[in-house]
Curated annotation (Swiss-Prot):
It comes from the Bacteria. GO terms for biological process: argininosuccinate metabolic process; L-arginine biosynthetic process; urea cycle. Signal peptide: none annotated. GO terms for cellular component: cytoplasm. This is Argininosuccinate synthase. ATP binds at A13, Y14, S15, G16, G17, L18, D19, T20, S21, A40, G121. Keywords: Amino-acid biosynthesis, Arginine biosynthesis, ATP-binding, Cytoplasm, Ligase, Nucleotide-binding. It catalyses: L-citrulline + L-aspartate + ATP = 2-(N(omega)-L-arginino)succinate + AMP + diphosphate + H(+). L-aspartate binds at T123, N127, D128. Pfam families: Arginosuc_syn_C, Arginosuc_synth. Pathway: Amino-acid biosynthesis; L-arginine biosynthesis; L-arginine from L-ornithine and carbamoyl phosphate: step 2/3. Belongs to the argininosuccinate synthase family. Type 1 subfamily. It is found in: Cytoplasm.
Length: 406
């Protein structure tokens, strides 16, 4: 049913890919409204080439292209990595963490353009629709949201490609490579197509950021990453901006085949889906961050922060970045990171990265005089007996009761 007249102007989160290329034309035909395209540069690289021209060719009146790379890494990726947030123990949340920033900027443009509506290209089965729309409502509780995938009858990749061909819309997708991808400075994700068979191995030519571990260099490479207050600030002694630092780690990790993950994850909407991810720089960063934390954080503080990881990661995955509980958790996590100052030395080799050295000039809690296995005068080993007996009390009581009652 036509919606013409209900909206005069809409701002579309535009990627130039299959869905959003078609949505520009569809919005004009279905709603009869002016369409303003917005493309967020969060590290897609050449994927953004020609975006303004493509948007205008398909009917958009304007196209904003905003360079958000530094803000993305500084204000979204780094805070998340202070929490060591990994969803279900595998997914580094590369797509999830980009959506709040894209939505934030999209809403700023909608306000400046006096647009009544915002629009996204997320499907009605996925998580992104939730992530976008929760953020939209955070910034404007009364905003009108248009989600074409929940309205139109173009319900498959094949039908979308046919629609595009019919209307002369160029799209960078062919039937030979039908899977979809989403790329930013933190990762690239792949889903759909051959990946919908959970038994099928991803084709090697799908990967874009990393070489196969089998084809990686035969010689390991070492990298030193410095952290201040839980954030990385330099690589091998060279200070870099947040976006530069992550981009450099992506190059190093990709060269050594680091950061590939093939995951069957649980979507917020209730279904399982398969995603294949490349997160080379993020994988190195998480390992290095852990290394510095281990030498600088108090045991109980570390355990407390780690207990929050599943909840924090799930909030980001489900789209609750702007929720008060995430902000409260972030404040606590950031407090724990004030002592995370130091350097981790990481070994990169054939798909693996591991910390092989860590140090902190200002916040190390490691005391070699206490930890040594050699003779020392700091630690009286006889004291351990009472400590053990006290901690064993509940176990001894339980054992005695079991014997008493058979």
């Amino acid at each position: 049913m036509s919606q013409k007249g209900s909206v005069k102007k809409a701002v579309l989160a535009y990627s130039g890919g299959l869905d959003t290329s078609i949505i520009v034309r569809w919005l004009i035909e279905e709603y009869g409204c002016e369409v303003i395209a917005f493309a967020a540069d969060v590290g897609q690289g050449k994927e953004l080439d020609g975006i303004p021209e493509k948007a205008r060719q398909t009917g958009a009146s304007k196209c904003y292209v905003e360079d958000l790379r530094e803000e993305f890494v500084r204000d979204f990726v780094f805070p998340m990595f202070r929490a060591n947030a990994i969803y279900e123990g595998r997914y580094f949340l590369g797509t999830s963490i980009a959506r709040p920033l894209i939505s934030k900027k999209q809403m700023e443009i909608a306000l400046a353009e006096e647009a009544e509506a915002v629009c996204h290209g997320a499907t009605g089965k996925g998580n992104d629709q939730i992530r976008f729309e929760l953020a939209y409502y955070h910034f404007n509780p009364e905003i009108k949201i248009i989600a074409p995938w929940r309205e139109w009858d173009l319900n498959s990749r094949e039908s979308l490609i046919a629609y595009a061909n019919k209307h002369g819309i160029p799209v960078p997708v062919t039937k030979k490579r039908p899977w979809s991808s989403d790329r930013n400075l933190l990762h690239i994700s792949f889903e759909g197509g051959v990946l919908e068979d959970p038994w099928a191995e991803p084709p090697e030519d799908m990967y874009l950021l990393s070489v196969s571990p089998e084809q990686a260099p035969d010689k390991p490479e070492y990298v030193e990453i410095e952290f201040r207050n839980g954030d990385p600030v330099s690589i091998n002694g060279e200070s870099l901006s947040p976006a530069q630092l992550l981009a450099h780690l992506n190059e190093l990790g990709g060269k050594h085949g680091i950061g590939r993950a093939d995951i069957m994850e649980n979507r917020f909407v209730g279904m399982k889906s398969r995603g294949v991810y490349e997160t080379p720089g993020g994988t190195i960063l998480e390992e290095a961050h852990r290394g510095v934390e281990q030498i600088t954080m108090d045991r109980e503080v570390l355990n407390l922060r780690d207990s929050l990881i599943p909840r924090y990661a799930t909030m980001v995955y489900n789209g609750f970045w702007f929720a008060p509980e995430r902000e409260a958790m972030q404040a606590m996590i950031d407090e724990t990171q004030k002592t995370v100052n130091g350097v981790a030395r990481v070994k990169l080799y054939k798909g693996h990265c591991r910390v092989v050295g860590r140090k902190s000039e200002t916040n190390s809690l490691f005391d070699p005089e206490v930890a040594t296995f050699e003779a020392d005068e700091v630690y009286n080993q006889a004291d351990a007996e009472g400590f053990i007996r006290l901690n064993a009390l509940r176990l001894r009581i339980r054992s005695a009761m079991q014997k008493k009652h058979g």
